[in-house]
């Protein structure tokens, strides 16, 4: 009896040892990889390697708008088949709110049976109250603006912008516009704040939509700011927004776009150690020489383009001819 018990115990031990030997633990599931950030060193190197300064001569004030030739404008006009127009501007915000710290000033100054008139003022032309076009005299790097012009000599509080002002675009911008509708790519109504849009997202959209932005085009990117606002209400946009990741900078240089339009100029909240929120905004404006349309509203354009399965169109942008101005309110128009 004792012998059988010892034998049984021995067999049990052998079985356990064998089971342990055969067990191979599976690797633990990993969460989504955190994309590396563009480092300050890379950012500084790109300022030299990707710069367009001097490309169109030492006296240039147009930057990549030089890529919009008469031939380019005629090709854009050929995209008009129906004569349907769509505004890309958000309505001017005349009341202060969480996302409008500096509203547009508006008031009636007369209203009689004979006539009526109002007054409108833009105390913060680059603020969150209106869709606007930035000139190169708006943001700078180390005391220099687009094409290397010294800021101290050419942009002053008393004299405004003697170079690179909004007046350089008095005759307007007409070119091919291309919409990159990232929420539609992802199958969502809008992206959540903090979402970073990478070059592969842009190229995935190109594959899905069958369209590609190129030299002299207007690159318009939608993340769904206004759709989110309509559903959830206003929120401080400087504290919560999606947008293009800084890794898009070399992609923009390669594509040679003439103009960029977006709903917000950056993404927040940002990962620890990231570059400042306006790093991409400032690089494109000052180093690449690409003018920017800030606070655009692409929701109506998204619907119009989807209804036609056409993501390219003629785009016109006409800033006010403000001498020595750093920017202007605009109402960009897409025409199908």
Language-model segments: residues:
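Active-/binding-site microenvironments in catalytic and ligand-binding cores
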Residues: 27-336
